[in-house]
Amino acid sequence: MARHPRWTLSQVTELFEKPLLELLFEAQQIHRQHFDPQQVQVSTLLSIKTGACPEDCKYCPQSSRYKTGLEAERLMEVEQVLDSARKAKNAGSTRFCMGAAWKNPHERDMPYLEKIVQGVKAMGLETCMTLGMLNESQAQRLANAGLDYYNHNLDTSPEFYGNIITTRTYQERLDTLEKVREAGIKVCSGGIVGLGETVTDRAGLLLQLANLPTPPESVPINMLVKVKGTPLADNDDVDAFDFIRTIAVARIMMPTSYVRLSAGREQMNEQTQAMCFMAGANSIFYGCKLLTTPNPAEDKDLQLFRKLGLNPQQTRVLAGDNEQQQRLEQTLMTPDTDDYYNAAAL
C-alpha cells in the first residue's frame, strides 16, 4: 500500500452509493480523459498447464481438491507453445499470454519459462504470464528473459479473503505484486465479483489495488462463473447493475489503467456489456474459453463491437504494425479456429 493512500474506504463507499447514472457519467468523463472511448484492447491467452492445482480457491475448477470433471493436462512442450504463438501472430495478435495452474513455479521450471518468453519475444510479440506466486529471483529472471506483463489477482478484500482461500495469504499476493513491479514487469491484478462478498468488500478490493505504490496497468474484473463441484457452485447470481457499478468505480479510482472484462462475459447479455464499456471497461479476452469456462466467440464480439461502434485497439509491435492490426480485425471478422483460448482469469 502507498504511504499516503490515494483513496480511503469512506471515499470509495461514497462512489458505490452514488446514483448509477451519475456514477456512469463520471466514469465515462474520466475514461475519455485518458483513453479513446471507441478503442478496446483485445487479449488472447494460452494455457501451458491446466488443472491439478494444489490450492483451495473455492471458485476454481482447476483445484485438485474439487471434483469438477476437469482433466488435468501436463505442461506443454516448448515448441507447442511457440507454434501457438506463431499462429497467434499470424492471426493478428500482438500480445501472447501464458497461464499455468500452479501455486508457484519451481526452480526446475524456470529455464523452460525463460525459453518460451524469449522465443515469443523473438517473434515481435508482447509477453504475459500468470503462474502463481513468484519470489524475487524468479521475477527478475522472467524480466531478464523479456516478460512484459505478469498477472496475479487479489481476488477480494483482505477481510473476506480467508473465506475463499486458505492456501496462500493475502500478504503473499501483495508480496508477489511488489516483486514483479521491482523487477520491472508491468502488473495485471484485479478480482472477482460474486464470491459472496459485500459491497464493502468490493470497495476494499479496489482500495487495495488503487493504493498500491503504482496501480496495476491492467485491472481485470471477473464475474463469478459457477462451476459444479466447486464450493461456490450454488452462489447467488450477480446483479448486472452491481457489476457495472464495480466497473465504474474501478475506472474512477484507476483512471489510467485498462479495466478488463474478464470471466463471466458469456453469461452477460449485450446490454450489460455495453453498459460496462460505458462505465469505463476498455479491454476484453476473446476466444472459446476463459480459464476452463465458456467465453463469447470471436464473431459475437465483433458483432457487438459493430453495434457499439467499437474497434480493436491499435497496438504497436516491433514490426508490421498495420499488417498485424489488419490480421487481427480479419480474424475477428472470420474466426475459423479454436487454437486460441483463454486459460486464466486475468
UniProtKB/Swiss-Prot annotation:
SMART domains: BATS (SM00876), Elp3 (SM00729)
Entry EC no(s): 2.8.1.6
UniProt xrefs under PROSITE patterns: RADICAL_SAM
Domain Radical SAM core: 38-256
Name of this chain's protein: Biotin synthase
Catalytic activity: (4R,5S)-dethiobiotin + (sulfur carrier)-SH + 2 reduced [2Fe-2S]-[ferredoxin] + 2 S-adenosyl-L-methionine = (sulfur carrier)-H + biotin + 2 5'-deoxyadenosine + 2 L-methionine + 2 oxidized [2Fe-2S]-[ferredoxin]
InterPro entries for this protein: Aldolase_TIM (IPR013785), BATS_dom (IPR010722), Biotin_synth/BioAB (IPR002684), Biotin_synthase (IPR024177), Elp3/MiaA/NifB-like_rSAM (IPR006638), rSAM (IPR007197)
Subunit structure: Homodimer.
Metabolic or biological pathway: Cofactor biosynthesis; biotin biosynthesis; biotin from 7,8-diaminononanoate: step 2/2
GO BP field: biotin biosynthetic process
Highest taxon listed in the record's lineage: Bacteria
Family: Belongs to the radical SAM superfamily. Biotin synthase family.
Binding positions for [4Fe-4S] cluster per the UniProt entry: 53, 57, 60
Keywords, comma-separated and alphabetical: 2Fe-2S, 4Fe-4S, Biotin biosynthesis, Iron, Iron-sulfur, Metal-binding, S-adenosyl-L-methionine, Transferase
Swiss-Prot/TrEMBL cofactor(s): [4Fe-4S] cluster; [2Fe-2S] cluster
Binding note for cofactor: Binds 1 [4Fe-4S] cluster. The cluster is coordinated with 3 cysteines and an exchangeable S-adenosyl-L-methionine.
UniProt binding sites for [2Fe-2S] cluster: 97, 128, 188, 260
Known role: Catalyzes the conversion of dethiobiotin (DTB) to biotin by the insertion of a sulfur atom into dethiobiotin via a radical-based mechanism.
Species for this entry: Salmonella agona (strain SL483)
MF annotations from Gene Ontology: 2 iron, 2 sulfur cluster binding; 4 iron, 4 sulfur cluster binding; biotin synthase activity; iron ion binding
